[in-house]
Amino acid sequence: MDKTIYSKKIAESLSSGNHPEEFATLFVTLLRQLVMGRPVSREALGTALGWSGQRVATVLEPAPGTEYDEQGNIIGLGLTLRETPHVFEVDGRRLYTWCALDTLMFPALIGKTARVTSRCVATGRPITLTVAPEAVLQVEPAETMVSLLTPDASPDIRCSFCCHVHFFASPSVANAWASTHPGIELVPVENAFGLGHLIAHKLLEDSERNTA
């Protein structure tokens, strides 16, 4: 796997290839709002960005997986207030992520350390991590693996990518699962973190370029 090419594909898939630099700016800002543990209105997001409501809507529209509450506030896009198998605790606030890789890349985007609790998708064994912006500080079991898949052309990255990206308690368990799931690549947590770090920095670079 060429990590640079792969990270670029993931970053592009997040925005469905549309307005990639503007989307990166919106995405990073939205994550930093969601990590406060509250729904984010489009108005509040626009204020944080210094954008009009129409510009927010235009950039957000190509992301079909965006989650909203009954009042139309944003409650999830990668990082979510809705329960998933991946618990992502920051500053004592309990949030969730769509997939295993999110837990490894979001600390770099929000600039905070996260305590992650998940389970092996094959055995149900608990998996815990402490992930800082620059390193994985702790992982249990130590041999935890992550499954990866190259996203297809679908605009919905949650279905085309996130639903296939899991934690596994050991290489043997991961290999057994992958044998019945074509196209899957398995990597140790540290390698997955390195990939997530590249994706995060690509998004941060795009965001900074858009606001320069």
Curated annotation (Swiss-Prot):
Belongs to the MerB family. The keyword Phosphoprotein does not apply. It comes from the Bacteria. Pfam families: HTH_15 (PF12324), MerB (PF03243). Its EC number is 4.99.1.2. It is an enzyme of class 4 (lyase). GO terms for biological process: response to mercury ion. The keyword Lyase applies. HAMAP family: MerB. It catalyses: an alkylmercury + H(+) = an alkane + Hg(2+). This is Alkylmercury lyase. Keywords: Lyase, Mercuric resistance, Mercury, Transposable element. SUPFAM superfamilies: NosL/MerB-like, Winged helix' DNA-binding domain. Cleaves the carbon-mercury bond of organomercurials such as phenylmercuric acetate. One product is Hg(2+), which is subsequently detoxified by the mercuric reductase.
